Each structure stands twice: as structure tokens, then as C-alpha cells.
Amino acid sequence: MLFVINLFFYHFWLLALGITGLNVLIMRLWAQKFITAQPELAEGYRQLFWGMLFYLGLPWLVMGFGIVVGGVPAPLYFLDPKTGNPFVLTFHLTLVFLWLLGFMWIYFWDGAEFYVKYITPLRRSSILTRSPLGVKIMAAISFGAGLIGLVTLWLFDFPGPGF
């Protein structure tokens, strides 16, 4: 049983990458009715799905590279950037890069409008994400929460396996 648990944790990044791909595939299937009704939306949805694979998949690929090639023993080690492990630091820099990219997209590159046009119809969205201003408010909350989480990882010591 311990072997199965260790195998799961060692390959967690691969499972997360697979779930990311599955989510994108499901959203693509949901979008098909919108593309059929309005074929001019096809290019925007294509950009959306490739963007999602990049934005949501890159951190898991970086983590997997660190585990398989870099000798990081398990995904839990990525919660302790203070170790100075270059693969763990690269993972955290990747997150910061993606947050900056997401921030620029939402606030300066019409990402909020794109979100309302392409993503809001795919899901039962909250009232906030039905307008570009609401998307920007939700993005600010999300970016703020992520920043608090990242700073917490750098400032506090968390006991755990291998720490």
C-alpha cells in the first residue's frame, strides 16, 4: 500500500497535467454548440483552449521536470522554496511569470472582455464574471490570494515529510 501512495505522490504532477487536459477537452466539447451557432467564434475558442493548456499545464510540467530530472523527491517539496533547490525556485518563478502574464492579459490586453465573450457562456458564472469590470475584480482577488499564499510559503516553516 505504501508503494501505491509513494507512486501516486511521485507522479502527482502527471495526474494534475492529465486532469488539466481533460478539463480543457470538456470545455471544448461544451463550446462546440456555441461554435456551431456562431462559427466566427471558432478562432477565439481555439486561442482560449491552447492558452488554457499553456497557462494551466506549464506549472505541472515544470514540477514534473524537477521531480523526474532534478531529483526533487516529491511534490510536497515544492511547498518549501526556502530550500534553494533550483527546480523548486524555477517552479515558483513560473507561477510568478504566469500571474504577471495573466494580470497583463486581464487588465491591459482585453482579457476581461475575452473572458466575458468566450468563458462566461460556458459556465454558470457568478454575477461578477458577467462583465469585464467584474472579471477584473475577481482577478484582483485571485491574484491577491495567490500572492498571500506565495509570501506565506517564503516566510513560514511548514513541517512535513522531508522538511
Stretches with model-predicted labels:
Residues 1-3, 46-91:
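Long, highly hydrophobic alpha-helical transmembrane signal-anchor segments
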Residues 5-36:
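N-terminal signal-anchor/start-transfer transmembrane helix
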Residues 147-163:
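Juxtamembrane boundary at the C-terminal end of a transmembrane helix
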